[in-house]
Curated annotation (Swiss-Prot):
It comes from Bacillus subtilis (strain 168). It is a peripheral membrane protein. ATP binds at G35, P36, S37, G38, A39, G40, K41, S42. This is Cell division ATP-binding protein FtsE. The gene is ftsE. Pfam families: ABC_tran. GO terms for molecular function: ATP binding; ATP hydrolysis activity; transmembrane transporter activity. The lineage of its organism: Bacteria, Bacillati, Bacillota, Bacilli, Bacillales. NCBIfam families: FtsE (TIGR02673).
């Protein structure tokens, strides 16, 4: 479970990104975070995986407060949070298999477990047949699906996706969304920040709309809304 309680975030330059946000996201939910540019969506997302720390308030992930945990505890919390970025962040000199395996290698997992788990998640994202290829040999959609595989290889409770279709064409975007929906159907919570109106309106998931750092709308089967 993800809980935010009266969360504020003010940056040193005076920008107030979040202004007293309180929200609960339950296990297994699929949630879109929408709003105009500069509304606070990215800050909201970054709070969940502790890339940003709140100025004030509580952020609880499975009852652990990310606002007060020690720095040395952060890597352990992140093991249960998968992150998918807009720009993939794949390592160009590693194969598809190696990119996904890296997430397990850094925590000291056994080689036999790594091989089994990596092949399982590559099969899930339908890229097992490209395990030995390098990122520059893949399409944009394929690279993003590798990124998704990497985000779930450690069996996270939550997957955070920050504009995962932002650099993709419409058809490829839908391929990525089908993959995220399949992950959600298997029980993983998915929280996704997006500007893609068509995807939000078609898939009919929970929508949290943020404007000027506050939640202005929270609907169980919501739509995107109108933003410039």
């Amino acid at each position: 479970m993800i809980e935010m309680k009266e969360v504020y975030k003010a940056y040193p330059n005076g920008v107030k990104a979040l202004n007293g946000i309180s929200v609960t996201i339950h296990p297994g939910e699929f949630v879109y975070v929408v709003g105009p540019s500069g509304a606070g969506k990215s800050t909201f997302i970054k709070m969940i995986y502790r890339e940003e720390k709140p100025t004030k308030g509580q952020i609880l992930i499975n009852h652990k407060d990310l606002a007060t945990i020690k720095e040395k505890e952060i890597p352990f919390v992140r093991r249960k949070i998968g992150v998918v970025f807009q720009d993939f962040k794949l390592l160009p000199k590693l194969t598809v298999f190696e990119n996904v395996a890296f997430a397990l290698e850094v925590i000291g997992e056994q080689p036999s477990v790594i091989k089994k788990r990596v092949l399982e998640v590559l099969d899930l994202v339908q890229l097992k047949h490209k395990a030995r290829q390098f990122p520059d040999q893949l399409s944009g959609g394929e690279q993003q699906r590798v990124s998704i595989a990497r985000s779930i290889v450690n069996n996270p409770d939550v997957v955070i996706a920050d504009e995962p279709t932002g650099n993709l064409d419409p058809d490829t975007s839908w391929e990525v969304m089908k993959t995220l929906e399949e992950i959600n159907n298997r029980g993983t919570t998915v929280v996704m920040a997006t500007h893609n109106k068509e995807i939000v309106n078609t898939m009919k998931k929970r929508v949290i709309a943020i404007e000027d750092g506050i939640i202005v709308r929270d609907e169980s089967r919501g739509e995107y809304g109108s933003y410039d």
